[in-house]
Amino acid sequence: MKNVLPPFIEIYRALIATPSISATEESLDQSNASLITLLAGWFSDLGFNVEVQPVPGTRNKFNMLASTGHGAGGLLLTGHTDTVPFDDGRWTRDPFTLTEHDNKLYGLGTADMKGFFAFILDALRDVDVTKLKKPLYILATADEETSMAGARYFSETTALRPDCAIIGEPTSLQPIRAHKGHISDVVRVLGQSGHSSDPARGVNAIELMHDAIGHIMQLRDSLKARYHYEAFTVPYPTLNLGHIHGGDASNRICACCELHMDIRPLPGMTLNDLNGLLNDALAPVSERWPGRLTVAELHPPIPGYECPPDHQLVEVVEKLLGTKTDVVNYCTEAPFMQTLCPTLVLGPGSINQAHQPDEYLETRFIKPTRELITQVVHHFCWH
């Protein structure tokens, strides 16, 4: 099978050269169809059965599932096909041209995380996938950088239940078994405009929001006091006020005010519980000013995630790498994969390069990543 696929670096180059930006702004958002076509062709060449799945609610985006083998269990290797937008003024290289310099591979998606598929393909090029004793699945998802729509849709619709999954996000090959979730909400206050010379004739939305923020700060303190997970560097749920806007003139009573905030819950905290806590915190303001305060989601929420520390996947990967699993504060698609099977986040490159100008992956990751993929496939699909 050695001659079926292009060389590793050419696969990498083709992936980086195929734009697949995800953005909430429609003018920047791109389909990942061309990238999915590339991947589907290569995995078909290796003998995989390939299914391309349109993702509802997206702008022409797709998941790809490549599968081989029969029966229950097996291994799922997964990652997302999209990247964030890039700031052209801050890049010193063409983001869509793979450039090797000073033991680094530069390009948009080299670390986060289109390059991971080049590693999978390269590791499998010498494997006769028809001889695996358990199934091997490769999932390429859409829209991770915005809504995680691809992972959500796959987890809600698939009947697959592998023994375990590995998501190849850039972790510097440090296995991650837990991370926090993310909830982003908008708090809106509707006041009543009027001339500032007669405050009694209006309802100042900024003043109501000031009251609401006081209660939100009390909730922040309560979350910090009540919930604790010492493995995290920030061992409690965080609550951040990120953006506020209200009013239009100094001599006008403010008619509306809007606050954007986020909460990063610990694993095990349910989204319903957090929504209830936020609504309870704001209840005094709502009762005092009926109909003037609302809370809504800015983005679909992401729950916290945790793989059981005593699971076989953790034991095997820790032994292969000679290192213990860790936890992180950022989010991945792991909560959705975890609904199917125990999941670890583990991949080449550094998270510090994600979403940065002149993104790169150090070439020192190439050999150990290829070896790791070969070893986990051998362990979970041949034993």
Swiss-Prot record:
Any one Pfam family match given in the protein's UniProt record, by short name: Peptidase_M20
UniProt-annotated binding residues for Zn(2+) 1: 80, 112, 169
Gene Ontology molecular function terms on file: acetylornithine deacetylase activity; zinc ion binding
Gene Ontology CC: cytoplasm
SUPFAM superfamilies assigned: Bacterial exopeptidase dimerisation domain, Zn-dependent exopeptidases
Free-text cofactor note: Binds 2 Zn(2+) or Co(2+) ions per subunit.
Reactions that this protein is recorded to catalyse: N(2)-acetyl-L-ornithine + H2O = L-ornithine + acetate
CDD domains xref list: M20_ArgE
Keywords assigned: Amino-acid biosynthesis, Arginine biosynthesis, Cobalt, Cytoplasm, Hydrolase, Metal-binding, Zinc
UniProt-annotated catalytic positions: 82, 144
Pathway assigned in UniProt: Amino-acid biosynthesis; L-arginine biosynthesis; L-ornithine from N(2)-acetyl-L-ornithine (linear): step 1/1
NCBIfam families named among the record's database cross-references: AcOrn-deacetyl (TIGR01892), PRK05111.1 (NF003474)
Function: Catalyzes the hydrolysis of the amide bond of N(2)-acetylated L-amino acids. Cleaves the acetyl group from N-acetyl-L-ornithine to form L-ornithine, an intermediate in L-arginine biosynthesis pathway, and a branchpoint in the synthesis of polyamines.
Protein name per UniProt: Acetylornithine deacetylase
Organism: Salmonella paratyphi A (strain AKU_12601)
Gene designation per UniProt: argE
